Amino acid sequence: MFKNKEQVMVVPVNYVSNVGNKFKLNETLTLQQSYCHYDSLGVYRPLYEIENNICFIRISTMLIIKNQYNEYLVKELHDKQKRPCLELGIHSYVKPQSGNYQAIYNQLIASTRNYFDVDLNFEYLGTIRDLANDNVKSILGNVYIAEINKNDFILKTKHDLYENKWYSKQELIDKYNKATSWSKIMIDIIVEELI
């Protein structure tokens, strides 16, 4: 049996036991602190070791990108059953090449390079977790937003498996049922105007 040896950052699950379901707005951490929050406790483990391990939780970054026209970057793709679905923003696990210091910041920079040729300014919004979904229960996402001028950036739009597009708030609402679990939580945040 093939084992996926890709490594991702994890922390002990009891460290994040106070993080409830859905979205928790940040009220205490500065942007700089959010980058370093898991540095001392985070360790890198192969995915196959932690897939169903209840002792650890994977740390990921979620970046919402908004332009001056109040449009949001989405990724249109097909899921494992070949059904069309969409992801809001950029999601990625924190990987070893991100290092042990400011690993979250380094991962944000690395993941945005797949979309834009310049660095973005991030704002830390809070954390996201979906305790109702077995597929993502063991993942905790740090949520950031970056606002850009659409005219100043070249969006790398085409990929073999998906296409990057800009959606208005109304388009997000209209295609809500096609959104991934985490994207639905973030769309709820946008609709409720928490950001």
Model-derived regions: residue spans:
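Acidic, glycine-rich loop-and-strand cores that form catalytic or ligand-binding grooves
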Residues: 110, 114, 118
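Conserved Nudix-box catalytic region and its N-terminal flanking loop in Nudix hydrolases
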Residues: 55-57, 64, 70-111
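Nudix hydrolase/Nudix homology domain
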Residues: 1-3, 40, 46-48, 81-96, ...
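A structural signal for short, well-ordered beta-strand segments
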Residues: 61-63, 124, 142-146
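A short coil-to-beta-strand element that immediately follows conserved catalytic motifs
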Residues: 117-127
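N-terminal secretory targeting and juxtamembrane "stalk" segments of secreted and cell-surface proteins
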Residues: 9-10
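Acidic, metal-coordinating catalytic segment for phosphate/diphosphate chemistry
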Residues: 2, 16-62, 68
